[in-house]
Regions:
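PRPP-associated nucleotide enzymes
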Residues: 1-125, 133-219
């Protein structure tokens, strides 16, 4: 495993973003681990998260300009911190996010920040894709921007579990919309990380058992 992936998983665990136990996903599945960017609470943590997203962005896209979109609410801080981290790397990208409820006074509208123009490409930054519902909601919101194309989606973790079909939710989104979905790490990276310490044996077994039932087929 690459060193930055190990560092990222350790960061998620230390920050309380990655938890092990008994949880219920939006899909209704009982899951043995949970990922929640809402547990990032300090400036140091969000700055570090932004640097990991920026590294992933530069590896996958390079210094190709685009506009970062962070869906409310968790995606907002990810978009802002990623834009700052990219600026530190010499790539100055604009960002924007949506309001949950449209504002009918002042500047008004659904979006806050830079509003992409016709022909510009948007990169969506999210914490995780479980069933793909949030991405589909984002696509509906962004469809009101004429001539704007979504180029990619970046998330923290690919859970590698079934979506609506035998494919993963990420693969389903890619197939449905025609753009790539990238993750900093996937669940098998997490398993490899956990296996380095014998005290994690129970969590490793539970995750493997879960994937044996709910794991997606590779494409």
């Amino acid at each position: 495993m690459e060193a930055y992936k190990r560092e990222f998983i350790a960061f998620l665990e230390e920050a309380g973003v990655l938890k092990f136990g008994d949880f219920t996903a939006k899909s209704g599945r009982k899951i043995p681990y949970f990922i929640n960017a809402g547990d990032i609470k300090t400036g140091e943590q969000i700055a570090k998260l932004g640097r990991f997203y920026a590294k992933s962005y530069l590896e996958k896209i390079g210094k190709k300009p685009s506009v970062l979109y962070g869906p409310a609410y968790k995606g907002i801080s990810i978009a802002v911190s990623s834009a700052v981290a990219l600026a530190d790397e010499g790539l100055n990208v604009p960002f924007f996010f949506n309001r949950k409820e449209a504002k009918d006074h002042g500047e008004g509208g659904v979006f806050v920040g830079y509003v992409p123009q016709n022909g510009e490409q948007v990169v969506i930054v999210e914490d995780v894709i479980t069933a793909g519902t949030a991405i589909r909601e984002s696509m509906e919101i962004l469809s009101h921007l004429d001539g704007v194309k979504v180029a990619a989606v970046f998330v923290m973790v690919d859970r590698k579990e079934k979506g609506k079909t035998e494919l993963s939710a990420m693969a389903e989104v890619e197939r449905e919309f025609g753009f790539p979905v990238y993750s900093v790490v996937d669940v098998y990276d997490i398993i490899e990380y956990l296996e380095e310490d014998p005290k994690n044996e129970e969590n490793v077994t539970r995750i493997k058992n879960y994937l044996a039932v709910n794991g997606a087929k590779s494409v």
